[in-house]
């Protein structure tokens, strides 16, 4: 499990660690898709992997190419449980299987916490952060899904594995 280095919160003596557990190592130079967001923010998809446990994990990097700080709170979506438990996260992401006519939401644990990157700090201009989102896997016959995160464009992704 990989995680981002701890960072100090401004005006605080505590060190807060961003949760970026993402499973296996991901090659950041692999660019499967690029989603444009608001104000110059770009999400680059590095891996979309189906595993034997019945999950699909999407791993990506979000970079602020704009000139203002990017607020990650919008990426959590508007579902009340996700927002309450995972405000600074990518918990609002979805996969859509157009053939099977089904939408898949980011998985959650029994406390409502998403199986995704949480505690994302506002991205300053030029900053980037690695993120992951884990979903229930669509049927093995589904090899392509539409992927969306609030404020980003939707894109089609091929599932490997």
Whereabouts are the PLM-identified features?
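N-terminal low-complexity, Pro/Thr-rich disordered segments
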Residues: 1-37, 86-90
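Surface-exposed edge beta-strand/loop patches
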Residues: 4, 8, 26-32, 119-161
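N-terminal edge beta-strand
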Residues: 26-27, 36-47, 111-114
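Extracytoplasmic
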Residues: 38-40, 51-57, 90, 128-130, ...
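Immunoglobulin-like IPT/TIG beta-sandwich domains and homologous Ig-like subdomains
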Residues: 46, 51-52, 122-126
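Short, well-ordered beta-strand segments enriched in hydrophobic/aromatic residues
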Residues: 56-64
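Short solvent-exposed strand-capping/beta-turn motif centered on an Asx-Ser/Thr pair
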Residues: 63-68, 138-140
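The feature marks short-to-medium sequence segments in extracytoplasmic or secretory-pathway proteins
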Residues: 65-118
């Amino acid at each position: 499990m990989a995680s981002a280095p701890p960072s100090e919160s401004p005006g605080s003596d505590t060190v807060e660690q961003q949760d970026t557990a993402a499973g296996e190592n991901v090659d950041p130079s692999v660019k499967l898709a690029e989603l444009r967001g608001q104000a110059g923010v770009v999400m680059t998809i590095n891996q979309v992997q189906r595993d034997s446990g019945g999950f699909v994990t999407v791993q990506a990097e979000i970079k602020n190419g704009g000139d203002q700080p990017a607020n990650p709170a919008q990426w959590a979506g508007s579902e009340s449980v996700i927002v309450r438990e995972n405000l600074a996260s990518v918990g609002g992401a979805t996969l859509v299987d157009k053939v099977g006519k089904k939408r898949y939401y980011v998985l959650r644990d029994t406390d409502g916490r998403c199986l995704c990157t949480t505690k994302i700090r506002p991205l300053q201009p030029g900053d980037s952060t690695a993120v992951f989102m884990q979903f229930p896997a669509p049927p093995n016959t589904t090899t392509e899904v539409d992927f969306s995160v609030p404020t980003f464009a939707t894109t089609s992704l091929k599932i490997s594995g």
